């Protein structure tokens, strides 16, 4: 694999192991990236197994050519939020043995200045996962109302100074538009008074804009609900999150479908009927990276893996 596609997959063994792979199983890697997790899945599959990978990044689709000669593998160019639609088109609803999701932005995307994801590298203020379509971060910042920007920064970045930053962006863009990552990062650094130790002042705003531009949290919601409809009995969900907003969605989803439907106290309903509404069971507790993995790959530090299994009722 070329250096351009180099990428260290986080919690690799734990995530793929959590799928409990069967020789002839059918699996989905909803976030192909540079293929680290897919490679491990293929190594564990038998010759009759199948892996469907999904990614909306054109560079990831290019990277998938490394598996072009493997008849068990296919790649779909699209968002993982639509995974149930792709599976339905393939006639595989109820036959999927596992879904893997590695959420957030990948290292190659962060490291490529031209993608505009990082405040540490100057490049076009883009931030689109699929840079062949949609509105860029620069275009959104040029038109967004102060209230809208403040809401995005607060909701998706948990930024305490959301309104102040939004006002400053609106005031400055009338003189000079924000076209580069450095333009935005420098402004935020300049106007932020109480800086967090070991954290760039622009971290939360960049995260918020990226999540908004790519509808990332909506994609997660859609993917999780879709996974329930396509998983076979005992099929597994193996999901890596990188910040609290992502993990909160995954955690609540698993909890909600593990507990079954809530019914008012006193209704004449049996425990068996309640159990039938349970669709998942959590497999163990949340898994964090080891100190050794964090030392090898600092970006693993905030990762959280959650695994769940589709119940057979």
UniProtKB/Swiss-Prot annotation:
Natural source organism: Shewanella sp. (strain ANA-3)
GO cellular component term, pick one: cytoplasm
The subcellular location is: Cytoplasm
One GO term of the biological process aspect = rRNA base methylation
Keywords on record? Cytoplasm, Methyltransferase, rRNA processing, S-adenosyl-L-methionine, Transferase
- Enzyme Commission code: 2.1.1.199
Binding positions for S-adenosyl-L-methionine? 35-37, 55, 80, 102, 109
Please name the gene that encodes this protein.
rsmH
Cross-referenced Gene3D superfamilies? Putative methyltransferase TM0872, insert domain (1.10.150.170), Vaccinia Virus protein VP39 (3.40.50.150)
Matching entries from PANTHER family are given as: 12S RRNA N4-METHYLCYTIDINE METHYLTRANSFERASE (PTHR11265:SF0), S-ADENOSYL-METHYLTRANSFERASE MRAW (PTHR11265)
Name of the protein in its database record = Ribosomal RNA small subunit methyltransferase H
Q: Key word rRNA processing present in the record?
A: yes
Q: What does the UniProt function comment say about this protein?
A: Specifically methylates the N4 position of cytidine in position 1402 (C1402) of 16S rRNA.
Claim: Hydrolase is one of the keywords in the record: no
**Which terms does the record give in the GO molecular function aspect?**
rRNA (cytosine-N4-)-methyltransferase activity
Q: What class of enzyme is it?
A: transferase
What HAMAP family does UniProt report for this protein, alphabetically?
Answer: 16SrRNA_methyltr_H
Q: Which family does it belong to?
A: Belongs to the methyltransferase superfamily. RsmH family.
Catalytic function, reaction form: cytidine(1402) in 16S rRNA + S-adenosyl-L-methionine = N(4)-methylcytidine(1402) in 16S rRNA + S-adenosyl-L-homocysteine + H(+)
- Database matches in InterPro entries: RsmH, SAM-dep_MeTrfase_MraW_recog, SAM-dependent_MTases_sf
């Amino acid at each position: 694999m070329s250096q351009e596609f180099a990428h260290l997959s986080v919690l690799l063994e734990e995530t793929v192991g959590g799928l409990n792979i069967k020789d002839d199983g059918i699996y989905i890697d909803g976030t192909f990236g540079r293929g680290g997790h897919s490679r491990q899945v293929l190594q564990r599959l038998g010759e009759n197994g199948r892996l469907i990978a999904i990614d909306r990044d054109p560079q990831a689709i290019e990277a998938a050519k490394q598996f072009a000669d493997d008849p068990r593998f296919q790649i779909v160019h699209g968002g993982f939020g639509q995974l149930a639609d792709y599976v339905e088109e393939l006639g595989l609803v109820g036959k999927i043995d596992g879904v893997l999701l590695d959420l957030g932005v990948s290292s190659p995307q962060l490291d490529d200045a031209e993608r505009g994801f990082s405040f540490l590298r100057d490049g076009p203020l883009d931030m689109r996962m699929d840079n062949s379509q949609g509105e860029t971060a620069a275009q959104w910042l040029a038109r967004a109302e102060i209230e809208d920007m403040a809401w995005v920064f607060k909701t998706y970045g948990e930024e305490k100074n959301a309104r102040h930053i939004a006002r400053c962006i609106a005031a400055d863009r009338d003189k000079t538009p924000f076209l580069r990552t450095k333009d935005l990062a420098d402004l935020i650094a300049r106007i932020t008074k109480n800086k967090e130790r070991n954290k760039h002042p622009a971290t939360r705003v960049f995260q918020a804009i990226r999540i908004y531009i790519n509808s990332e949290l909506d994609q997660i919601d859609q993917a999780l609900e879709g996974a329930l409809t396509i998983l076979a009995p005992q099929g597994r969900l193996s999901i890596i999150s990188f910040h609290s907003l992502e993990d909160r969605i995954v955690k609540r989803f698993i909890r909600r479908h593990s507990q079954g439907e809530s019914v008012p106290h006193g209704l004449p309903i049996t425990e068996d009927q309640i159990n039938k509404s349970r669709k998942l069971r959590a497999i163990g507790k949340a898994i964090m990276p080891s100190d050794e993995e964090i030392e090898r790959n600092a970006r693993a530090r905030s990762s959280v893996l959650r695994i769940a299994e589709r119940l057979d009722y």
